[in-house]
Swiss-Prot record:
Its EC number is 1.2.1.38. Its main location: cytoplasm. It comes from the Bacteria. PROSITE patterns: ARGC. This is N-acetyl-gamma-glutamyl-phosphate reductase.
């Protein structure tokens, strides 16, 4: 079995990773780590997340100052850490032949200036930006198999790209009219740290990051076309529902659209394309699926995509990428 560790295990995504990895038949979860300053250091993860009692009763160990020994003892590491932290940790693990699955945005776009503009830090490892493979599992499996650094796609970018890529690949969209993505995420997408915006009495349905959210350039870069993206915070715990509007090329039929989706996802079990009806968050929460449905009228298409932001949008896709990297069935440990 491959020895796996999680750094940043006390957050929502880290806890989901722990739950998935503890029962994985090919990965042995050997350690959970948090920063030395974390208020959760030395606590048992199941004391923080009671749903993990008798499933994952492991301590949240403070990350040691010297990481070489830890990196040498692990075969793969999942970084559920802040972008700047992943930026600093990934090179150490890679230098010690440990495969890195990074759930932050630190290596998703091969452009150092992007990080200065959208993440607020200077990227010091341009060589790793070139080496990193973007972890959109259904579309980049071949490249994922050949890399030791996977930059797992973001939550909004995952559902947005899975919904749009087949139509762009089959040249069905008139991109003179930019696709418009309006997506609503549950409060868990804001992380576990307490803020006024995400507190119980303050949380509401509201747009944020209008025209300046860091996921917009991530989506545009990997789609190969600009988009208009507006994220929203919803007053529910988990899940993302994306409503995507685009213009079809003249004469494009529903059958051509179905064929495009079938061609893309017929052998991809974690994407479910609806024959009728439209996805909902209820259908995907607590699952590793992305569900897609569409309706067309008067030369336009409205696509509805839904996923669990903590699973297909984060932890489950990270494990899916690890499965692919090790030549395993990509759904192993997820279904």
């Amino acid at each position: 079995m491959q020895k796996a560790i999680i750094i940043g295990a006390s957050g929502y995504t880290g806890a989901e990773l722990a739950r998935l990895l503890i029962k994985h038949p090919e990965f042995e979860l050997t350690g959970l780590y948090v920063s030395r300053q974390s208020q959760d250091a030395n606590k048992c993860i199941s004391d923080i997340y009671p749903q993990l009692k008798h499933l994952v009763d492991l301590p949240l160990q403070p990350l040691p100052e010297q990481l070489t020994q830890l990196a040498q003892q692990a075969d793969l590491v999942f970084l559920a850490t802040a972008h700047e932290v992943s930026h600093d940790l990934a090179p150490i693990f890679l230098q010690n032949q440990c495969k890195v699955f990074d759930l932050s945005g630190a290596f998703r776009v091969n452009n150092a200036a992007f990080y200065r503009t959208f993440y607020g830090f200077e990227h010091q490892h341009p060589e790793l930006l070139t080496q990193a493979v973007y972890g959109l599992a259904e579309w980049n499996a071949h490249q994922i198999k050949q890399t030791d650094l996977v930059a797992v796609a973001g939550c909004y970018p995952t559902v947005s790209q899975l919904s749009l890529k087949p139509l762009i690949a089959h040249n069905l969209l008139d991109l003179t009219q930019l696709p418009v993505i309006n997506a609503v995420s549950g409060v868990s997408g804001a992380g576990r740290k307490a803020t006024l915006t995400s507190s119980f009495c303050e949380v509401s349905l509201n747009a944020y990051g209008v025209f300046n959210h860091r996921h917009q350039p991530e989506i545009a870069t990997h789609l190969g076309t600009e988009v208009i993206f507006t994220p929203h915070l919803g007053n529910f715990k988990r899940g993302i529902l994306a409503t995507i509007t685009a213009k079809l090329k003249t004469g494009v039929s529903d059958e051509q659209i179905r064929v495009a989706y079938q061609h893309a996802y017929a052998d991809k079990p974690l994407v479910r394309v609806y024959e009728q009806g439209l996805p909902s968050i209820k259908a995907v929460e607590f699952t590793p699926y992305c569900d897609i449905g569409f309706v067309t009228k008067n030369g336009h298409i409205i696509i509805i995509g839904a996923e669990d932001n903590l699973l297909k949008g984060a932890a489950a896709q990270a494990v899916q990428c690890a499965n692919i990297r090790y030549g395993l069935t990509e759904t192993l440990g997820l279904l």
